[in-house]
């Protein structure tokens, strides 16, 4: 099968491409590398800045590349906004992809109209990036996302593509829950793909427990990293001889992985029900995740045995108490590390996941 993957979020498409190639598929990945993270790709769509001039150059570059994006059996776009262009500019390229290829699939892997809408209804989720119970989280960054996706052209584009495409793949429970009321027939859930980490066959814990926290300055409040860091600093003050904090800010993915490899515990995404790509990458390396591990996460995977994730409620005290509990029961950490790796092997192995994609794409091709 000839497959085109367009766009990138958190290494999802790059890892999926590896799995598909391992299964003998012909895959091309075109993306801008998810900005400064610089994930691998075959065709580079990187945009240097948000200036108008740079936008014109990027538009012309993509227009020139479009003949290379024809005659594929399957095209999958990472998001409705799958190119480094304004939403209004996408229709031209989307229609070309539809005309000149086989089936087209939409990824529900990140910020989009249906995810924002589900968070704001204060019913779909007990808590999310956009709500705590019945209260909407009004923060500057949240308000920008709400404006962009619910009130602006991004939302219009999202609704158009979701209605027009051949299928929708959700990579997390939250995204699945956002789309399910509207597209139950064309929607499926497939776990994010993760490569097995050969250098982490037997993860060990040193004298101090190393707590890893990745910080995106522009999204710290939105993702709850600021709250998690405050709780972690309190733990460090309480147990100075038992723990160490590894802080990482806005580094490329390869450097991020290197710094993560020597850690024991990762703190990630306070408002999530589920572990996303960074947490899953950490689990493959034998780290224990403190973050989203709600029952819905295990239910959608049909996982009735493993519980490797330290689930926290979206507040500082919950994070603090769970971190203290980890330190006071550090003897359990080696077992939790092994469970993390088994969880990844069972549900997220990139070759198994790639086969699930092939099965879904083929099921739609037969209709």
Residues of each region from the PLM?
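A charged, aromatic-enriched C-terminal amphipathic alpha-helix characteristic of glycosyltransferases
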Residues: 331-362
């Amino acid at each position: 099968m000839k497959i085109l993957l367009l766009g990138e979020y958190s290494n999802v498409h790059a890892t999926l491409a590896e799995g598909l190639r391992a299964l003998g598929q012909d895959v091309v990945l075109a993306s801008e590398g998810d900005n400064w993270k610089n994930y691998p790709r075959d065709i580079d769509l990187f945009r240097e800045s948000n200036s108008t001039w740079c936008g014109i150059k990027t538009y012309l570059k993509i227009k020139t590349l479009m003949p290379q994006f024809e005659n594929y059996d399957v095209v999958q776009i990472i998001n409705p906004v799958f190119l480094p262009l304004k939403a209004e500019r996408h229709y031209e390229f989307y229609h070309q992809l539809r005309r000149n290829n086989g089936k087209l699939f939409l990824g529900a892997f990140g910020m989009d109209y249906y995810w924002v809408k589900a968070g704001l209804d204060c019913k779909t989720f007990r808590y999310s990036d956009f709500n705590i119970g019945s209260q909407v989280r009004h923060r500057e960054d949240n308000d920008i996302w709400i404006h962009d996706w619910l009130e602006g052209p991004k939302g219009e584009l999202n609704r158009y593509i979701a209605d027009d495409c051949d299928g929708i793949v959700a990579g997390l429970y939250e995204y699945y829950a956002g789309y399910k009321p509207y597209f139950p027939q064309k929607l499926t859930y497939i776990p994010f793909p993760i490569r097995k980490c050969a250098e982490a066959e037997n993860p060990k814990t040193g004298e101090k427990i190393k707590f890893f926290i990745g910080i995106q300055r522009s999204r710290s409040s939105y993702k709850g990293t600021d709250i998690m860091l405050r709780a972690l600093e309190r733990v460090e003050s309480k147990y100075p001889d038992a723990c160490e904090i590894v802080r990482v800010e806005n580094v490329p993915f390869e450097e991020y992985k290197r710094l993560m490899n020597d850690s024991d515990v990762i703190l990630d995404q306070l408002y999530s029900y589920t572990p996303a790509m960074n947490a899953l990458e950490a689990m493959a390396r034998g780290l224990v995740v403190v973050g989203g591990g709600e029952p819905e996460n295990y239910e959608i995977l049909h996982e009735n045995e493993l519980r490797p994730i330290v689930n926290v409620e979206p507040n500082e005290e919950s994070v603090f108490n769970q971190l203290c509990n980890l330190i006071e029961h550090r003897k359990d950490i080696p077992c939790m590390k092994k469970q993390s790796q088994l969880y990844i092997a069972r549900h997220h192995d990139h070759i198994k996941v790639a086969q699930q994609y092939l099965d879904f794409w083929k099921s739609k091709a037969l209709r």
